[in-house]
Amino acid sequence: MANSAANSAQPNRFFGTEIEYGISSPDNPDVSPILTSTQAVLAFAHEQEEGLSGRIRWDYAPESPLRDSRGFDLRRYHQPPIVDPNAVGAANLLVQNGARFYVDHAHPEYSSPETATAREAVIADRAGDKIMLRAAQLAAEATDAEGNPGPVLKLYRNNVDGKGASYGAHENYLFSRETEFDDIVAGLTPFFVTRQVFTGAGRVGLGQIGQESGFQISQRADYIETEVSLETTLNRGIINTRDEPHADSNRFRRLHVIIGDANMSEVATFLKLGTTGLVIDAIEDGVRFDDLQLRNPVEAVHKVSRDLTCTEKLQLADHVTWMSAVEMQYEYLRRVESYDQQGDVVKLWREVLDVLADDPRKAAHLLDWVAKYNLMEGLRTRLGAGWDHPKLALIDIQYSDIDPARGLYHALVRRGSMRTLVTEEEVDRAVEYAPESSRAYVRGGILRRFGKDVVAGSWTSLVVDTSGVYRRTRDVESPGITLAYITLDEVDRFTAAECGDVLESAETVAEVVEHLRTLGAVREQ
């Protein structure tokens, strides 16, 4: 078993999250969520861009969502679409903290900026809740052309609507293109199946439409239908094969993980990202997990989610060995712990597994599903009710309410009943400023300081006007405009260490562009 990474410096494992929020309008329950999601994004855009008449456009040219890691491409066209960033269902925004905020299907989605540690990722992820909450407040304060008030919006960090629909809480991990994708599948499938014991958000109802009464660990489990798939909205797989790195495609792939739940718990989010990163480190270093393959992984996903004792055994592919989800996680921990150079992920991982092995209900201060279960079980006992009681479904949704004044998770935090890992000050700063450890620093910093000069952008590009004309006219066809095309293919470049002095002291965006030109980031047209 290889172990070189345990004794040498590992390159940063860049992380990112994508949360599709549940959305409702209590005063108008029949209104289209596509419309309300658009209203939320545009309200936030109006504030960030100071009411500019010409919105910053999302640059779709680098995107390839139908390219598959198994070597084929399902793209139906090869020209990027021309999309109005204000259109209903298509509202799209680059945020000054380096994130993307847009409408995805019928949900407002926050895609966090790239971060270099799991803790940074938790901070950036939590900043998304505050941005969403601000967007909802701004939408409610807005008025339409006739002077009618905007909608009251409620936003939830969950994955199911109770009517059969599921929406995503996706994770992203950059890894080397030299790594065989089959090794990724083999190494991560048993891990993803069993990590539910600490990543689950908890759910009332069994089956996709909750057709059976009961409680289960994961909100996402019933929607996993196959082992490997490119799809994210149907026939969902344990492993998603999308090959869209948003980086140098000759060097990197991006592992797009769709099996996870939307967590409120910072411990769960930290472990979800940190442990997965360590397993990828080990896979890239040659560690094998062939002996941990499950006989029926999809069935095991459902079985683990419904085992509230965390003790039910899963049959491995050798037809002889049986392991519980917690036992499987202990084995993963043993094989990858030497890759955790800081030791913080492994320490918390072991603590949580020890509690789950003793008595899962003792993990209520750490994990969403246990906290939610204990709240519901207490109410169920007082009412003498079954799991189909409507008040339990109400707790399910209220737990995930991102409004600190109303959400049950936030009430537990205020009471000291949930462990947190980051400070409110860190999260507040992450709303305004991009992480300093990745290219997000330049993307967000240019938006923060020179947003009026930005014409378009994406994860890997920015188009800015260095003449000063665009900030006055908001018309890219105006005479005298001089466009600079900034390429940000290298995720670990253009950090605060590399660009901070110039970016923060520059008086014009042209000065920043000149600095980036010396770093090879400006593409000449």
What are the functions of these language-model segments?
Residues 1-151, 155-156, 189-201, 206, ...:
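Terminal catalytic/cofactor-binding subdomain
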Residues 159-176:
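Histidine-centered divalent-metal-coordination microenvironment in nucleic-acid enzymes
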Residues 173-196:
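Helical (often loop-to-helix) elements that flank the catalytic cores of nucleotide-handling enzymes
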